[in-house]
Structures are given as structure tokens and as C-alpha cells.
From Swiss-Prot:
High-level lineage: Eukaryota, Viridiplantae, Streptophyta, Embryophyta, Tracheophyta
Residues the record lists as binding Ca(2+) 2: D71, D73, D75, Y77, E82
Subunit text: May exist as monomer and dimer.
Listed Pfam families: EF-hand_7
Positions annotated to bind Ca(2+) 4: D140, N142, D144, E151
UniProt name for this protein: Polcalcin Cup a 4
Residues that, per the record, bind Ca(2+) 3: D104, D106, N108, T110, E115
GO molecular function: calcium ion binding; protein homodimerization activity
Domain EF-hand: 22-57, 58-86, 91-126, 127-162
Length: 165
């Protein structure tokens, strides 16, 4: 018999999206502070200035390494989307793993269409098995018809960062 998540677990799963949405909004505000000239992107010099103003002793090589990590499109600047992606992926891995456990009802390391549907229904989201299969199909990188923890993290972070575009 499937174990039904407690109301606390269900609240945790549904509140996870709200927390991520709030995080995106907060990151947008931080981004605006980093973006000293207001051009919608952070340059290496803006990053260095803000880090130094916060008391961080960073050298040019460290700033360059930070920029390379964040600047995924290689244009030499960090866009809002890149900034949000970098911060959400690092900050929420533990939260997402905890949310994954709520969906993985049989604790086998994957979420089946039935588990996805049951969990969504338990938090008041209408769902059919067919809809669950479609959701899974969109994020199922390895083609096994299930969602593993990495695919779940990708699904959740892309859903949140899409809202900041």
C-alpha cells in the first residue's frame, strides 16, 4: 500500500514552489544592486566593485573565474537569467532533494507517473496519469519513463527560472 504523505510533507512540496518564486524575486533585487550602471547585465568590474565594497579581497583571477562560471552564454557579462540560474541551482539542491522525497512515495529513487499524479492530487492539483506521463516525458533525459532526482531538480529549477525571463 502506498504511504500517503503527511500534511506537513504536502505543505512542504507545495510551498517549495512559493519559496523558489520568492527567491527569484529576491535575486532580481540583488542583481539590480550588482548592476551598478543599470544596463541589465553585470560586468566583471561591477562584480569586483560590489565584492570589494562588501569587504571581500578578490583579485582579478578570482573575479574572472566567477564570471566564467556564471556567464553561460559567453558574452562576457552575467545576465539576470544567468545570475538567477547560478544562485538557484546552488541554493536549492537540498530543498529540491527533500521535495523529491515527497513525490518518490515508494522511496526507490524515481518518480513514476502514478506517484506524480497521486502527490499532485494530495496537494489539491487535479491530475490524470496521462498528464503525469506528459510531464515526465518533457524532463525524462534517459527515456525510462520515470523522473530521477537530477531530472526533478532540472524540472523544478527550469520552471522557476523561466518565470524570471
Amino acid at each position: 500500500m502506498d504511504e500517503v504523505p503527511s500534511s506537513d510533507e504536502s505543505k512542504s512540496a507545495s510551498s517549495g514552489k512559493r519559496v523558489l518564486e520568492q527567491s527569484v524575486h529576491e535575486l532580481e533585487e540583488v542583481f539590480k544592486k550588482f548592476d551598478a550602471n543599470g544596463d541589465g547585465k553585470i560586468s566583471g568590474s561591477e562584480l569586483a566593485d560590489i565584492l570589494r565594497s562588501m569587504g571581500s579581497e578578490v583579485d582579478e583571477a578570482e573575479v574572472k573565474a566567477m564570471m566564467e562560471e556564471a556567464d553561460t552564454d559567453g558574452d562576457g557579462y552575467v545576465s539576470l537569467q544567468e545570475f538567477v540560474d547560478l544562485n538557484i541551482k546552488g541554493a536549492t539542491v537540498k530543498d529540491l532533494k527533500n521535495a523529491f522525497k515527497v513525490f518518490d512515495r515508494d522511496c526507490n529513487g524515481t518518480i513514476s507517473p502514478a506517484e506524480l499524479c497521486e502527490t499532485l492530487k494530495s496537494v489539491g492539483e487535479p491530475c490524470t496519469i496521462e498528464e503525469s506521463k506528459n510531464i515526465i516525458h518533457n524532463v525524462d533525459k534517459n527515456g525510462d519513463g520515470l523522473i530521477n532526482v537530477e531530472e526533478f531538480q532540472t524540472m523544478m529549477t527550469s520552471e522557476m527560472t523561466d518565470k524570471s525571463k
